[in-house]
Amino acid sequence: MRILLVNYRYFISGGPEKYMFNIKTMLENQGHEVIPFSIHSNKNVATEYSKYFVEPIGGRDAIYFEEVKKTPRSIWQMLTRSIYSKEVEKAIKREIDDVKPDLVYLIHFVNKLSPSVIRGARKKGIPVVLRLSDYFLLCPRFDFMYEKRVCEECLTKGYRSCIKKRCVKGSLFASVVRVFSMKFHKLIHVYDGVYAFITPSEFLKQKLSANGFEEEKIHCIPTFTASKTKVGEPQIGSYGLYFGRITEEKGVETVVQAYEKLQKYTVKIMGDDTTEEAIRLKRYIKEHKIKNIEFLGFKSGEELEDIIKGARFTLIPSIWYDNLPNTALESFQYSKPVIASNIGSLPELVVDGENGYLFKPADAEDLIKKIKLLDDDTVVEKMGAASRRRLESRFSPETHYEALMKVFSEAVKNNK
């Protein structure tokens, strides 16, 4: 099968891109041809198909909204890429004409490519399968968060809540544009052109089906790990570990609050420590002279793996509806118990008392209780083994591939 893989970044910047390259490798290893469509960036992985890529909004060095210089041209591009871009539609149709794919597998496109990629593919008679990593189809700011708490007002009261609260980037303009784009996409039924929606979690699947999306078109196919490293014998480490993005919704503040009261315990926090949230937390730790919390910064490769191996357990303290984070599966790979917030998809990963513990989101006292339950090496070893078994039974590459190919084959067969 020849598959056109669409994502607005062609370099690793987070979980969706890790998945993109992992699935690309997996499909190619199974004999499929995978061809990318994306946006030009100086960070992109080299590919002969970059000649089809579209220009970014703010230059090839800009990645995030805040880095884009606001000019009349860039503002116009922001609008079209949020609502509908004829430029992008033309580009993907040109690539489809040349490479003649059997199917489009769409990952991330919102605000950078626009749903014109869906229309472009359908106008060329190519079926589209869309994988969802967040809640952009339901929430204007993608994460159901407002002021450090879960908010679903847009589902119950309508999108005026988003505009009133300036939910998107704290900006009235950005909030209005996002709400308008969502209403416009609904008006033109652009997502009717998607043959199937792939969700990593049952939680996201249920959210979609409860809010107007056809249940028979939604398929829960959990992601997988694809590390080539030999894990070796499990280790019972000496410290707790958080690794991942250090942003408000990830709940790292709860970890800091807990370990401030657990002076005999140690925690390491690994991830980009230049974010606004990381800087704030590091300042707090310094001001309060907390010695048992260590920020490691961003790590990768063998260094990252060694730090995970050396952990006693890992922490996923999210305060948002986290959607099957890769950090959980990476923890399972190294036979680590996981202490996670009881929110979103996390109970699908952590069975309380079996391969870790669940605690009340943002509740440092409850987290402290769960940390102390892992003082016993026997419990740590038993739960770590359960994590590994859970990974192999539910989140293996083989399981993911089989389920995904079933959807792909049906999409191509039933394409009209």
Name each model-derived stretch:
Residues 279-302:
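Nucleotide-activated donor-binding/catalytic signature segment of Leloir-type glycosyltransferases, i.e.
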Residues 1-50, 99, 124-127, 257-260:
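N-terminal subdomain of nucleotide-sugar transferases
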Residues 366, 379-394, 400-406:
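A short, well-ordered alpha-helix in the C-terminal region of glycosyltransferases
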Residues 352-353, 357-364, 371-378:
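Conserved acidic donor-binding segment of nucleotide-sugar-dependent glycosyltransferases
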